[in-house]
């Protein structure tokens, strides 16, 4: 069972079965469509207040040769999100002699990542960056990026994202959502951040960790004895402080930014995931570009993504060192044994979710 926790009232919790499935039947898709419609009402209201509503200022000028893109993201000014977006903006301005310009709106001013993705689905926002785990309701394929221990190391991760398999996954997500995946950001190495010391796998038993409610994650961590819990991002600190949860699965950069180490000073170096973030564009906006503009945008997107990943990896390493400097305790943990324990449960859920073919392709990348 997956725990849903309200840290301000720990008695208010509920559980959902891990058998919860991705919507595949017509009736499920109908319900999802209804939910999306309701969610879009909020998303479009946000878009309207910032001048990005479809039909008003989508970004396309009267001239087919000129375009102003609006790019929303959830990061602050010094994150790889912002720095990568700025790189893309500058490359486009340079390569198109100013025909394609970009306005960047960070700090979630257009809503959280799922809301911005919904705006793109509706054609109300041109571009954004989104975590794959937040769009699995819309794209079953995006679940592949939520599988723990998917990559052998950073080199493998890079080759997957930059190679044919990464392109295939991007195309599948694009086909499922009508939002084009241009390239991949990311690069944070995820670890176990806890108020309790985790130095052996036995220490995981009964540990309540905040995680995203995606099935591969839930199944894997339950196999390790963890109690996966869902807590709103802004309430994690308080939830740990009050003892509602023991910690979370997170990368060093955001552990440092959110000061989680103040209440959860133990970091077990599980490196069970290297984050992937999707650089996306509304299909409607993409279709308004001519062939040469599309080519230029794709080239620039890949350049900006490579730069953003480099920045993210560096920030991640720097943050881990800073966390240790500020008193966080780093603990080695048996990653090989962890992978052995989760292998069979993950094999079953990967097959059940129809991800085996693409998972095998990812693992086969050399």
Where are these regions (language model features)?
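C-terminal segment of classical bacterial N-terminal signal peptides
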Residues: 44, 50-63
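Short, flexible coil/linker elements and helix-boundary hinge sites characteristic
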Residues: 3, 31, 50-51, 94, ...
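N-terminal secretory signal peptides that target proteins for export/translocation
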Residues: 1-39
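N-terminal secretory/targeting leader peptides
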Residues: 65-157, 164-366
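A residue-level detector for conformationally permissive "hinge/kink" positions
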Residues: 23-35, 43, 47, 51, ...
């Amino acid at each position: 069972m997956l725990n849903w926790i309200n840290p301000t009232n720990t008695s208010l919790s509920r559980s959902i079965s891990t058998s919860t499935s991705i919507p595949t039947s017509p009736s499920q898709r109908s319900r999802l469509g209804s939910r999306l419609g309701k969610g879009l009402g909020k998303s479009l209201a946000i878009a309207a207040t910032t001048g990005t509503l479809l039909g008003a200022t989508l970004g396309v000028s009267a001239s087919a040769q000129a375009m102003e893109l609006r790019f929303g993201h959830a990061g602050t000014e010094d994150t790889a999100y912002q720095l990568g977006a700025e790189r893309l903006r500058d490359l486009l301005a340079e390569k198109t002699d100013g025909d394609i310009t970009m306005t960047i709106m960070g700090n979630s001013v257009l809503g959280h990542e799922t809301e911005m993705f919904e705006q793109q689905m509706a054609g109300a926002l041109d571009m954004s960056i989104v975590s794959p785990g937040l769009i699995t309701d819309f794209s079953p394929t995006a679940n592949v990026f939520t599988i723990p221990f998917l990559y052998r190391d950073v080199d493998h991760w890079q080759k997957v994202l930059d190679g044919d398999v990464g392109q295939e996954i991007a195309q599948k997500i694009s086909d499922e959502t009508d939002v084009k995946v241009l390239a991949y950001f990311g690069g944070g190495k995820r670890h176990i951040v806890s108020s309790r010391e985790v130095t052996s796998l036995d220490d995981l038993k009964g540990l309540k960790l905040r995680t995203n409610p995606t099935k591969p994650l839930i199944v894997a961590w339950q196999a390790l004895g963890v109690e996966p819990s869902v807590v709103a991002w802004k309430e994690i600190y308080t939830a740990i402080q009050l003892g509602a949860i023991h910690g979370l699965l997170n990368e060093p950069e955001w552990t440092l930014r959110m000061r989680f180490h103040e209440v959860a000073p133990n970091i077990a170096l599980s490196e069970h995931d290297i984050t992937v973030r999707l650089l996306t564009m509304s299909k409607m906006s993409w279709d308004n570009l001519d062939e040469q503009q599309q080519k230029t945008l794709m080239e620039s997107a890949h350049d900006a993504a490579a730069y953003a990943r480099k920045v993210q990896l560096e920030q991640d390493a720097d943050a881990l060192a800073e966390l240790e400097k500020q008193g966080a305790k780093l603990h080695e943990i048996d990653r090989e044994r962890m992978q052995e324990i989760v292998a069979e449960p993950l094999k079953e859920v990967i097959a059940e979710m129809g991800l085996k073919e693409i998972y095998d392709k990812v693992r086969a990348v050399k």
